[in-house]
């Protein structure tokens, strides 16, 4: 097992940037919302697993993140399995934007499952699709080595994800990726994580808005309760965002957190990202 200084140095070197895209194989062709760097990062992250536990992908959309994780895992030399969670539904607008080569469905809330199954077919024996509202899902699958979160679009759902999935992380081994961590319209993510700073160590900012963390201590119920964000007042939410700015000083520009504070001020009481974005409109 690597010690923490070695893991910090490993991520600081950003070795995923040296991964040739050809190494991703068929995963490189799967439609995705990921940035080019995120695509390489997920593949590299899968490839570096130690066999400590499952890989969990929260917020899969058309399978882009799962495919890149799977392409890396397949090269790891370890047994592997990805649990991918989503409603697996899409609006026509998102479909047209991210899958322009696919026939446009006639209505919104279109079924993505046939496409996802096709996209992940090369690894079909190594992936389980969990269909439905993540807010109603429970994790009972044992230790998690990689937890990718692209689903905490509201404060209440962020709390649910933490309660259900964070306790399965293995200190010293497990990597948590908060893919939307620095989005100005999701300030509850940094507000939650800063109160869990005794349990997580920031490893790397993966542009545009992702942050990777190392689990360094077990997640207790008391810690999760203290970190909860669903019922925070605007004032307390802003206070935690300021704490997070100090925590991430040197890794993330202060302007990122200033933008979050401006969103909270502009949209009092709003705790859903799409509502902030819509109101900002």
Language model: regions and residue ranges:
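S-adenosylmethionine/decaboxylated-SAM
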Residues: 8-11, 25-28, 47-281
């Amino acid at each position: 097992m690597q010690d923490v200084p070695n893991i910090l140095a490993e991520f600081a070197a950003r070795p995923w940037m040296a991964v040739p895209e050809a190494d991703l194989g068929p995963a490189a062709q799967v439609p995705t919302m990921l940035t080019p760097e995120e695509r390489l990062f997920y593949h590299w992250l899968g490839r570096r697993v130690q066999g400590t536990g499952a890989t969990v992908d929260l917020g899969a959309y058309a399978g882009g993140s799962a495919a890149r994780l799977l392409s890396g895992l397949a090269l790891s030399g370890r047994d592997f399995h990805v649990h991918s969670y989503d409603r697996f539904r899409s609006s026509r607008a998102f479909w047209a934007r991210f899958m322009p080569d696919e026939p446009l469905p006639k209505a919104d809330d279109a079924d993505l499952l046939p496409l996802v199954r096709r996209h992940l077919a090369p690894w079909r024996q190594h992936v389980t699709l969990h269909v439905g509202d993540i807010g109603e899902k429970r994790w009972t699958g044992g230790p998690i080595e990689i937890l990718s979160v692209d689903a905490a679009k509201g404060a209440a759902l962020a709390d649910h994800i933490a309660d259900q999935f964070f306790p399965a992380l293995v200190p010293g081994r497990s990597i948590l990726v908060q893919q939307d961590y620095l989005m100005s319209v999701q300030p509850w993510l940094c507000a939650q994580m800063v109160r869990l700073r005794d349990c997580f160590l920031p490893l790397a900012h993966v542009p545009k808005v992702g942050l990777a963390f190392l689990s360094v201590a077990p997640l207790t119920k008391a810690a999760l309760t203290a970190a909860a964000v669903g019922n925070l007042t605007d004032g307390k939410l802003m206070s935690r965002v300021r704490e997070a700015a100090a925590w991430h000083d040197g890794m993330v520009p202060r302007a990122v957190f200033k933008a979050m504070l401006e969103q909270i001020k502009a949209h009092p009481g709003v705790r859903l990202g799409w509502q902030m974005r819509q109101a900002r409109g």
